[in-house]
Regions:
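A glycine-/small-polar-enriched, mobile loop at the entrance of the PLP active site in fold-type I
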Residues: 2-58, 62
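Active-site C-terminal subdomain of aminotransferase-like
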Residues: 11-12, 188-274
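Conserved beta-loop-alpha segment that forms the PLP phosphate-binding cup at the N-terminus of a helix
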Residues: 51-80, 84, 88-92
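Active-site phosphate-binding strand-loop segment of PLP-dependent enzymes
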Residues: 113-164, 169, 182, 190
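Conserved PLP-binding catalytic core of the aspartate aminotransferase-like
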Residues: 282-314
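PLP-dependent enzyme catalytic core of the Aspartate aminotransferase-like
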Residues: 329-377
Length: 377
């Protein structure tokens, strides 16, 4: 087994693994499970400080992105796709699948969305049913201010769908200070629960838009509206993955018990960037670094596969490459959730330094030592 230091999925704590092995009831029929699910959703609402309805869907985080688009999009709807990263641009595919007309607002992939520049665009064109935006676009590691972006969109009467799969639990997010209508999360990133669950936070306005559609939602599994009154009706649209939800519940308990989780993510991310920069390793981003992942450019003269292979074979540590327009250009270190501890990052930096030097790439400092010095400040 490798030490998993990827940009997600992440390492999983033993108590989460144990919770997923507990005896199961029938989640379709046992009324106690409806209470368990409902209470777990209430914990999710507490994470984001919201009265918006929290839901858990059976499916990896991408399900939430598609479900949001499936449930809101009608044929011909214009949808603003805020694109400053691979996942940001990817929302356009979901919009098109359900008959919408995606309009891309494309910005520099090396920086977060500039709210003032987005507003300048909206002044010229704001006829959109909703907009999509990514909180942390993991391929580049950029972190967008989705709270402020959603408030700007609301000013122009535009609903917001936000993907926080790779940010939430590592980055603070206050839905009460936003106008986000559907927030999409996943289990396998900073919460450090195995992949398999989508979490959604849905506003009344979004539910009203779904209920008042001219055409039926063109999906069953991705139909969020079917979940709206699950507790009152004691009915789920499909059988809930009970073992996954038991693991999620313990993951949430771990999160609430960790009083320094956001501070630690921010500090470890900053120290990681400082060490890499001091070592002469170029970061992909110019600004807007997320607290959950650090993305570095592949040095000239080597390939991403050489770096990844050496990390795995020589040190037993798995980090991430990338795909799409960043394929072969960057590698990524995930320091989120259970990965976000000094004792996890230090051997990762030591392995990276050993790998680069083995491949003939000089490193200007001791990465691990520089990281520890920064952590001690």
């Amino acid at each position: 087994m490798y030490k998993i230091m990827t940009a997600g999925p992440t390492q999983v704590r033993e108590n989460v693994r144990m919770a997923r092995s507990l005896e199961c009831t029938n989640p379709d029929l046992d009324m106690e499970f409806f209470d368990f699910y409902h209470e777990t959703c209430a914990m999710l609402s507490k994470v984001t400080n919201t009265e918006n309805k929290a839901l858990i869907l059976g499916g990896e985080g991408i399900l939430g992105l598609e479900a949001a688009c499936a449930s809101l999009t009608e044929p011909g709807d214009r949808v603003l796709v805020i694109d400053n990263g691979i996942f940001g641009k990817g929302f356009a595919d979901f919009v098109k699948i359900y008959g919408g007309q995606p309009v891309l607002y494309t910005a520099d992939y090396h920086n977060p969305i500039a709210v003032a520049e987005l507003e300048a665009f909206l002044k010229t064109d704001h006829d959109f049913k909703y907009a999509t935006v990514v909180h942390c676009d993991t391929p580049s590691g950029v972190c967008n201010d989705v709270e402020e972006i959603s408030k700007l969109l609301d000013k122009y009467g535009i609903m917001t769908v936000a993907d926080t799969v790779a940010a939430l639990f590592g980055e603070p997010l206050d839905l009460s200070n936003s106008k986000i209508d559907i927030l999409c999360g996943g289990s396998q990133k900073a919460l450090s629960v195995p992949p398999g669950l989508t979490m959604l936070w849905v506003s009344d306005r979004a539910f009203e838009a779904m209920a008042n559609r001219r055409t039926p939602i063109a999906s069953f599994y991705a139909n969020i509206l079917l979940f709206k009154d699950y507790y009152e009706n004691k009915f789920f649209p499909y059988t809930m993955p009970i073992s996954d939800i038991k693991g999620l519940r313990v993951g949430l308990e771990n999160y609430f018990a960790d009083q320094t989780i956001h501070e630690r993510h921010a500090k470890i991310a900053a120290a990681t960037r400082k060490a890499l920069t001091a070592g002469g390793i170029k970061l992909y981003l110019a600004s807007g670094w997320a607290n959950t992942v650090t993305v570095l450019e592949v040095p000239e003269g080597v390939t991403d596969r050489q770096i990844l292979r050496s990390m795995e074979e020589d040190y037993g540590i798995m980090i991430s490459g990338c795909f799409d327009v960043l394929a072969g250009k960057v590698v990524r270190i995930g320091h989120m959730g259970e990965n976000c501890y000094v004792e996890q990052v230090v051997p990762t930096l030591q392995a990276l330094q050993g790998t680069l030097e083995k491949l003939g790439i000089p490193v200007a400092c001791d990465l691990a030592k520089t990281f520890l010095t920064e952590m001690g400040k």
